[in-house]
Every structure is written in C-alpha cells, then in structure tokens.
Amino acid sequence: MNNFIEFDTSSLWIALPEIFLLSAIVIVLLIDLFLDKNFKQVTYYLIQLSLFITGLLAFNLIDHPQIIIFGGSFVLDNMASVFKVFMMAATMVAMVYSRHYLRTHSLFRGEYFVLVLLSVLGMMVMVSGYSLLTLYLGLEILSLSLYALIAIARERADAIEAALKYFVLGAIASGLLLYGMSMIYGISGSLNINDIASFASNTNLDSRETLIINFGLVFLVIGIAFKLGAVPFHMWVPDVYQGAPTSVTLFISTVPKIAAFAMLVRILVDGLDSMHAYWSDLFMVLSILSIALGSVVALMQSNIKRMLAYSTISHVGFIMLGFVAGTPIGYGAAAFYMLVYVLMSLAAFGMIILLNKQGFEIDQISDFKGLNKHAPWFALMMLIIILSMAGVPPLVGFYSKFFILQQVVSAGFITIAVIVVIFAVISAYYYLQIIKSMYFDETDKKITIYASIDIQLVLSINAILILAVGLFPDFWMKLALSLF
C-alpha cells in the first residue's frame, strides 16, 4: 500500500487520455455555464471534439508494451488502448444519434453532455484499473453518472422510477462487489491485480485460504454479473431500458458493456485465472440462464425497448460463455462478441431514435408497420441489423456466435453448445416479428423521417459496417485475439 505514496509525474503521459478528458469536462462545464440556451450546440460540438481527441490519444498508445504505474493501480496495455478507442467511437456515434432526440424532448442541455463525459471517464478508469480500488473507483464514477442520466427527464415518472430501481439495486450490487474485494484483499494482503494473481497461483494455499478466496470470488462474480445484466441479477435491465429516455437507453446498452467486460478480464483473467476451475462453473450457470431467460421472455414483449433489453441479457450470456473455455482464444471470442454486440445495439437503438418525432416516441414493435413502404432504405438497414442480432449468416452476428460456440465445443462442453443453439433458434422468432411488421403489416399512418442528414448517414454506415464485418471478419477477430 505504501506504493500509492510514490507518485512519479514522469509517467503521467500514460494516463494522458484520462487527464485530457477530465480537463475537457471541467472546460465544457465552465463554458456551458455562460452559454445561452440557444447556443447549446456549441457544447455538443465541444464534447464530440473532446471524445475525438481522447480517442486519438488512446489510439497512439496501441501496441505500446505493458506499463503499470501509480503504485500498480493503473495499467497501459493493448486491451486498454483498443477498448478506449472503441468506447470513444461508440460514444461519438451514440451522441450523433441522440442529438435530434435530445432537442425534441427538451434534453439538449449541458448537464446531459457533462454526465456522458463523466461516465466515459469512469469507464476509462475501469479499463485501465489494475487494483481493486481503482476498478471500484471507475465503476462508481460510471454508476453515479448513469443514475443521474436515467433520471434527467424529471417530468417522466417512468424515468424516475427506473433511476431509483437502478440506484437501489446498483447500491446492493456495489456492496456485494466491495465485500468480495475485501475478502480477496484480506486473504492476499494486496489490492494489486499482479499480487493477487501471484497469491492465487500459489500451490501451497491451505483449505482456509482457498475457501475465503472462493467466497470472495462468488461475491465478485455476483457484483459484475449485475453490472452486465446477467440472470438472475437482471431485474433492473428491462425497467431501465423501457423507462429511461431512449438516448440514455442507447448509451447504457452499449458503451458501459465494454467497461464491464474489461473489469471482468482484469479481475478474473489477469488476477484470478489460476482459479478458473472455480469461477468457470459459476459463469456456465449464469450464461445458460441468461441465454434461456433472455430468449424466452423476449418472445412475450410488444415493447421494442423491453424486447431489446431481454435480447441484451441473452447476448450477455453468450459473452460470459466465452470465459468458460478458459483459453486466450475463448477470451478473444468473447471480446469479439462484445464489440459486435455494441455495433449492433448502437444501430438498433439508432433506428428507434431515427423514427421518433416531436410528441411521439417509438416504443412498440407495431410502430414499425409499413416502414418498407414509406422508408425502404431504412427498412433494409433495420433488416440487416435484426438478422445480424438473430445470428443469420453471413452477417457478423452469426460469426460472433459461431466463434463462441466453437470454443465451448473445443473445451468439451458439447451438451452446453447444443442447449445454446436451441435457444438461439428460439430467439430468432422475436427478431422476425420486427421484420414481419416492417415488410408485411399494413398501416394507415405515414412514416416520415425527421432526423437530420448526419444521423441518417451515420446510421447507414453503421448498418453497412455490420454487413461488411460479417463478410470480412478475420481482421476484427485477429484484433480481439491480440488483446489476450
């Protein structure tokens, strides 16, 4: 712990993306205070510029040899840099999609943008955290920002209710996570991930030490499973996705998943990989439950945000399944799936926002009726997105599922793979409901696209990218594998 006192300023360049973003938050907040409400566009462009420069700084650190600084609490490695670039890109896209929605729902305010930047800062700390304390600090910065974002539409009772549910359940999950961390710290004597890894790999551990580590592991897995939205810790997901403003749902469903995945890797792969035999069984149960419940309950939903919430739970199950194999290729397959999920989810919620207009919010599957007749290009884009989510070849959603199942079979869990395939087939049905609504159901209502050209352009690129990555998945899979 004394290492925390030794603060070497010559190493600050390693945390330059975080330092720049923190400075940008302060500057944007100050500038926004003096801007008239008619000039909030300036704040929007400032945060986009801040995200772009932060992403550029992180990109310049890709392929840099691993460096651990600040007394072992902060790490620069390839995974951290790549994830930060993806987080900046995904947040920029999410903000482009959200701009029209924020204007029409009177949420185009400086505090919204600052909260987004604060949550991104928390995620960056989580991605580079290399001690239990740093990881928890990043998680709380993220969580507190998200609580406020969900409740930012103060006049909406469902948004306030969703924020309260998320806050209460999040506080319980944070307590469980902290309790698990305290047990690991108590038995290993260190908060540092490297020290914990050395202790856990010690073959001379007695039964008492092994028991305490296992108990700590259980609480850690429960805490992280809640943040990911895995069954049975998923209760907040449907309510938050449905109750929060759609722009917030878009953000919550995508970028924080990258940070939660990174936290999972730091604690369980970097720190407790030698205990894989213990935590892999937990992951297997959680992943199967998530895939099963997410696939079945989504069939009963008519609200598209709620349906996509259960779809997210199912996707989280697939991501966790990649960890069961316990190999670098398995972890790489999980990372690939996670990045693909973010790409698909951005596009799906982007389509929902695209169809929103003043005084009317798209939230039912039936609202997509006749989309092909009135906006055939965007019906085609939605078709690509939905088929990819369903795992139809040759789209990227198919390859992400295939790589995960390949690793599960390679690890000898053939029965698990068969069960997962069955539920994947079941899940295709609720995706087909949207396609049926767009192409085969008639409506008297005329669908008009009110969104600006930049949103339409970025959304089209997003959907085409899903198709392109599916046709040429090798580069992205190699990138994911290079992280481990």
Swiss-Prot record:
NDH-1 shuttles electrons from NADH, via FMN and iron-sulfur (Fe-S) centers, to quinones in the respiratory chain. The immediate electron acceptor for the enzyme in this species is believed to be ubiquinone. Couples the redox reaction to proton translocation (for every two electrons transferred, four hydrogen ions are translocated across the cytoplasmic membrane), and thus conserves the redox energy in a proton gradient. The chain crosses the membrane at residues 11-31, 42-62, 79-98, 113-133, 134-154, 167-187, 211-231, 248-268, 279-299, 313-333, 335-355, 378-398, 408-428, 457-477. The lineage of its organism: Bacteria, Pseudomonadati, Pseudomonadota, Gammaproteobacteria, Candidatus Pseudothioglobaceae. The keyword RNA-binding does not apply. It is an enzyme of class 7 (translocase). This is NADH-quinone oxidoreductase subunit N. It catalyses: a quinone + NADH + 5 H(+)(in) = a quinol + NAD(+) + 4 H(+)(out). NDH-1 is composed of 14 different subunits. Subunits NuoA, H, J, K, L, M, N constitute the membrane sector of the complex. The keyword Transmembrane applies.
